[in-house]
Amino acid sequence: MARVAWGLLWLLLGSAGAQYEKYSFRGFPPEDLMPLAAAYGHALEQYEGESWRESARYLEAALRLHRLLRDSEAFCHANCSGPAPAAKPDPDGGRADEWACELRLFGRVLERAACLRRCKRTLPAFQVPYPPRQLLRDFQSRLPYQYLHYALFKANRLEKAVAAAYTFLQRNPKHELTAKYLNYYQGMLDVADESLTDLEAQPYEAVFLRAVKLYNSGDFRSSTEDMERALSEYLAVFARCLAGCEGAHEQVDFKDFYPAIADLFAESLQCKVDCEANLTPNVGGYFVDKFVATMYHYLQFAYYKLNDVRQAARSAASYMLFDPKDSVMQQNLVYYRFHRARWGLEEEDFQPREEAMLYHNQTAELRELLEFTHMYLQSDDEMELEETEPPLEPEDALSDAEFEGEGDYEEGMYADWWQEPDAKGDEAEAEPEPELA
């Protein structure tokens, strides 16, 4: 009955835009709001029944709802995570001071909880049931795009199918079957690789690529401007990612007070550690190794070419935080120090930049804490709070023979269809459909 009600509600969507058009997490249209799990579940049901247009419509809606939830979580937690007041140690010290410190800690927790409750009470994303953890992981890995590209293709929306397939591959570059579909779509539309669009791309990715191109062309001034902007935008997105990891958590076991808190904290830690990898750009099918360090590497040489040795030295010192054994950068720092009098450099000019120190310390401490939880808090299935759903993909990789032959492959993911066109431009085997919302 509830499913029918949601279905009737979504008939009102009409010509609503794609998941990122005219978006506002504060003023999300009430008529577009529904539980993420319901939207995604209905999309998969329609996919199973080969109702391609309806499936694509709900998949796009689910992606939009996921973004709404993600941005709303990050907003509230960022606004409720101000610096704690300075602690005043008890002059007597000892157990009294320890007791007071614990009370201050839990007082701070209660204050933040009250702030979050006030914030979430005003935002649309929290007016519907919260999705389960496994579903959020699926969206983080861009799994919905694996369904979406094929549903769009079968609905004769090839341009959007190309973007959806490419978006999935940007996070899953080794998924051979989707790569083959993307090549097929590109061949039908004559779409060059340079024209492909990542629907989940962060703003800093394009700025970083432009900075690298300017660097390679010798325009070091413009390159440093763009690289500094890319660095600043990345760190802002990283901070929002950390804040978004403090959202709702499920716990189904009865536990003592401190173990229960530790479980929730460990889950949040894992999410925060994953932020670095999840935000790393994919360039040409490869993730940029040590992305933040790479930006400082470019800045170091570009500033040197601009004769701004002070910034070059600080960029080199910042890079060394992430790769202290890099012999080339070590030699660069030795060179800067040797000529420090010539350039008027002070000792402070050989210190890492403030934002580099903060980012390095954050990521290092998060990894250390997570390693601690893995070593000491996972015995006796302490961290296994729920059973997760089995993966939607088969465990065995598909061979080319399976792909080219007839019959089933990736059961539950793609229809029993694959046929190379006789000539470029042949249409897919599907009835013409009206425009998708």
Swiss-Prot record:
- Species of provenance: Homo sapiens
Q: Where is the signal peptide?
A: 1-18
User: How would you summarize the oligomeric state and partners of this protein?
Assistant: Interacts with PLOD1, P3H3 and PPIB. Identified in a complex with PLOD1 and P3H3.
GO annotation, biological process: bone remodeling; collagen biosynthetic process; collagen fibril organization; peptidyl-lysine hydroxylation; synaptonemal complex assembly
- What this protein is called in its record is Endoplasmic reticulum protein SC65
- Ranges for the region named Disordered are 381-437
Q: In which tissues is it expressed?
A: Detected in fibroblasts (at protein level). Detected in spleen, prostate, testis, ovary, colon, pancreas, kidney, placenta and heart.
Per the UniProt entry, the glycosylated residues are: 361
Query: Biased composition, Acidic residues: where in the chain?
Result: 381-413, 428-437
Report the sequence similarity comment from the record.
Answer: Belongs to the leprecan family.
- Cellular component terms per the entry's GO annotation: catalytic complex; condensed nuclear chromosome; endoplasmic reticulum; intracellular membrane-bounded organelle; nucleolus; synaptonemal complex
